């Protein structure tokens, strides 16, 4: 049994347990299928409900918004009091904030004299109006160095904590802190929020994340864990709008606000949204142009929702495997807006065609007539957790490839810092084919003259490969222990099933390359080849 117990601080193991059962449930307070959503939450065993409340543009009734937020939290905690609900404070403010009164407690928290006034939109904007930071006259990125912005963020954090929320997503933190040199004001604000949570939160703690690979100030991290969207590489030689995931950056390590230290903090990854589509008319562009326009002309969740049900299931499985190999936590898509990527589908209550503007993971039924029916896929993925632990992963700190100033003990030969595995498989892991200098397929030194790299190959087939030392083609290794020069000398390996984990192992002094494979058919036990 996993441990989900915490109070005031959270241990690393418990934090990871929560993130391993995380779901993105965007604006769940507005769902039209709450009863079935609660059933699905319980059925799946979700422990972290991301983005369950919040808004980008202010709701018409502020008190109603927080009333609905509190009501949702109460109903969720009735089915499982251990669940963490997350609310959002995004990188956006609009003029309607001018009608929201500032409570006296907010002024008092900042040591100010209470005033009978509302928030001021004008006082939150960046004064110099950098390009793209002002959105016409009525919208803008807030500037955290402005006191009014910090009053706004603190107010919203306090209201969500009072409503039963124990996590906050702080959006694109590096944008609204652009003028906050050294993150001084942001750090002060976050400490104020934590102080409030220690007194008033359900379990005396609020977890804060943002879209960031990490903010470390003299070794101390601002965020409790990190969050980021996935990054893709389009695959154009397969039928359909196919893509693979690629590693982008890493998660910063240091001293966590909860008192523990790690070389790399846990990070949560999601299918993000930003309007549904980035190309209105797909017929107006070439296939190549659309492939490289975000996710085939969609945002991330829009692309995912517009795949077939079978393709969705396979991509969920692929994402889970990719995340395990790269030490990420997959925040499954439970509910997410589709906007312009809305999907025509048959209703589960009357059999009529309709258009779904939200992705819902629920089984399609009269109780959730526009569900995408992926509950069982997620259950199989999460039930396979023990088997997934057998996978040999890449190092937790993915930015450290090792082999710096390492020498073979017997001969004194210096080992190369840069070793790359390349070949025809590379486009299916997000690299250029036959690129012997690729950072994407650079191998990690793990000691004992050995370099490794684990990847997930989504398509069955035969692939060629070779290992290049120093990223050059002067001495490459593959099927035997003898070096070759040039790009044409390679070995071959066969992937029998889609979504197979492949691990390349290169022993520098022995000049051997070994390939191990794990296939996870989630209905069966894993196979080792």
Where are these regions (language model features)?
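Compositionally biased low-complexity segments at domain edges in trafficked proteins
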Residues: 496-528
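Surface-exposed flexible segments
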Residues: 344, 349-352, 359, 469-487, ...
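Acidic/polar N-terminal loop/beta-strand segments that form early-domain functional surfaces
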Residues: 51-54, 88-90, 424, 456, ...
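Extracellular Ig-like/FN3 beta-sandwich strand-entry sites
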Residues: 460-462, 499
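Glycan-processing catalytic domains of CAZymes
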Residues: 1-408
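Aromatic-rich carbohydrate-binding modules that target alpha-glucans
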Residues: 412-460, 470-493
């Amino acid at each position: 049994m996993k441990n989900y117990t915490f109070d005031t601080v959270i241990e690393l193991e418990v934090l990871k347990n929560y993130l391993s059962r995380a779901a993105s449930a965007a604006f769940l307070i507005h769902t039209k299928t709450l009863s079935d959503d609660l059933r699905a939450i319980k059925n799946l065993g979700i422990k972290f409900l991301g983005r369950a409340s919040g808004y980008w543009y202010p709701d018409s009734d502020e008190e109603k918004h927080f009333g609905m937020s509190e009501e949702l939290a109460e109903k969720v905690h009735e089915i499982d009091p251990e669940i963490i609900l997350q609310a959002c404070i995004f990188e956006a403010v609009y003029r309607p904030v001018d009608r929201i009164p500032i409570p006296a407690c907010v002024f008092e928290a900042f040591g100010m004299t209470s005033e009978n006034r509302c928030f001021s939109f004008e006082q939150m904007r960046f004064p110099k109006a950098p390009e793209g930071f002002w959105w016409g006259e009525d919208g803008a990125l807030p500037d955290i160095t402005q006191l009014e912005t910090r009053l706004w963020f603190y107010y919203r954090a306090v209201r969500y904590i009072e409503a039963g929320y124990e996590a906050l997503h702080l959006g694109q933190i590096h944008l609204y802190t652009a003028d906050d040199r050294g993150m001084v004001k942001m750090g002060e604000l976050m400490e104020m929020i934590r102080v409030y949570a220690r007194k008033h939160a359900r379990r005396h703690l609020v977890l804060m994340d943002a879209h960031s690979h990490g903010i470390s100030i003299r070794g101390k991290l601002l965020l409790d864990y990190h969050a980021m969207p996935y990054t893709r590489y389009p695959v154009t030689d397969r039928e359909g709008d196919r893509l693979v995931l690629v590693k982008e950056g890493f998660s910063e390590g240091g001293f966590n606000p909860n008192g523990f230290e790690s070389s790399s903090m846990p990070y949560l990854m999601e299918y993000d949204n930003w309007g549904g589509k980035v190309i209105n008319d797909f017929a107006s562009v070439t296939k190549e142009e659309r492939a490289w326009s975000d996710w085939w002309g969609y945002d991330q969740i829009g692309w995912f929702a517009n795949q077939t049900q079978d393709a969705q299931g396979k991509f969920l499985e692929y994402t889970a495997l990719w995340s395990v190999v790269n030490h990420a936590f997959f925040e499954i898509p439970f509910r997410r807006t589709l906007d312009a990527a809305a999907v025509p589908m048959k209703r589960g209550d009357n059999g009529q065609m309709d258009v779904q503007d939200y992705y819902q993971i629920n089984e399609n039924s009269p109780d959730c007539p526009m569900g995408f029916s992926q509950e069982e896929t997620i259950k199989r993925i999460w039930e396979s957790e023990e088997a997934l632990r057998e996978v040999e992963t890449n190092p937790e700190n993915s930015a450290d490839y090792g082999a710096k100033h390492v020498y073979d003990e017997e001969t004194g030969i210096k080992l190369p810092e840069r070793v790359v595995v390349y070949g025809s498989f590379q486009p299916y892991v997000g690299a250029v084919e036959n690129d012997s200098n690729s950072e994407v397929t650079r191998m990690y030194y793990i000691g004992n003259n050995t370099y490794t790299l684990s990847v997930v190959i989504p398509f069955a087939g035969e692939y060629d490969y070779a290992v290049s030392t120093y990223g050059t083609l002067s001495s490459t290794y593959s099927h035997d222990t003898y070096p070759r020069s040039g790009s044409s000398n390679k070995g071959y390996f066969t992937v029998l099933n889609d979504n197979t984990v492949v691990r390349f192992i290169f022993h520098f002094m022995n000049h051997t390359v070994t390939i191990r494979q794990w296939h996870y058919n989630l209905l069966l036990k894993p196979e080792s080849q």
